Amino acid sequence: MTELKRRPLPHDFHPPVPSFTVTSEDVPEGGTLKDDQVHAAGNTSPHLRWEGFPAETKSFAVTCYDPDAPTGSGFWHWVVFDIPASVTELPVGAGSGAFEGLPQGAVQARNDYGSKGFGGAAPPPGDGPHRYVFTVYAVDQEKLGPDADGTPAFVGFNLRFHTIARAHLISEYEVPADS
């Protein structure tokens, strides 16, 4: 996928909010995702750590989105919200398997694979590099509103009105045409 064909990020259409810092031991900003975060390989949610968010933050949400998926609407790989404001880090695998690394009270919505939790990168062979946008949202309320059956679109709708700051990391992954 060439730069000219790249689709916008979902929060490009939201009101501007302050930024803060998100880092990861697994998601290299501007680099290539590790196999651990690929659906056909490890399929494991990455480590994420954040800081510098507003003091009035009441909770956090984390998403992983592929705007380049050939669906017309992108592809949501991970949606978790109601992460307590005291939590500033998710360990590797928090959104995978038994979700043992998620803090109490956090809610995982269904991803576009139809399951709750993290679903790794899986671009079609030969479709070029896809961006995987890991976003952490600082939220102005402890409970965002949706429950675990909320769709990514409904969670995103609620985030549109309750995000007070946002940070993201973007990595890419590509499957060659001959795979």
Curated annotation (Swiss-Prot):
InterPro entries: PEBP (IPR008914), PEBP-like_sf (IPR036610), YbhB_YbcL/LppC-like (IPR005247). Coiled coil: none annotated. Residues 1-14 have a biased composition (Basic and acidic residues). It comes from the Bacteria. Residues 1-31 are annotated as: Disordered. PANTHER family: PEBP (PHOSPHATIDYLETHANOLAMINE-BINDING PROTEIN) FAMILY PROTEIN, UNCHARACTERIZED PROTEIN YBCL-RELATED. Belongs to the UPF0098 family. This is UPF0098 protein SCO1794. It comes from Streptomyces coelicolor (strain ATCC BAA-471 / A3(2) / M145).
